[in-house]
Amino acid sequence: MERQNVQQQRGKDQRPQRPGASNPRRPNQR
């Protein structure tokens, strides 16, 4: 269960870190 929690936290951290990857509408921010 710890692995799942880590993966969820990573996905949340990756969203703000790489908004261009998850947000194709904001390619300018990348």
Curated annotation (Swiss-Prot):
It comes from the Bacteria. GO terms for molecular function: DNA binding. Residues 1-30 are annotated as: Disordered. Keywords: DNA-binding. The protein sequence was determined from Nine Mile phase II cells. Might be involved in DNA-binding; the protein binds DNA in gel-shift assays and immunogold electron microscopy shows labelling of condensed chromatin. This is Protein ScvA. It comes from Coxiella burnetii (strain RSA 493 / Nine Mile phase I).
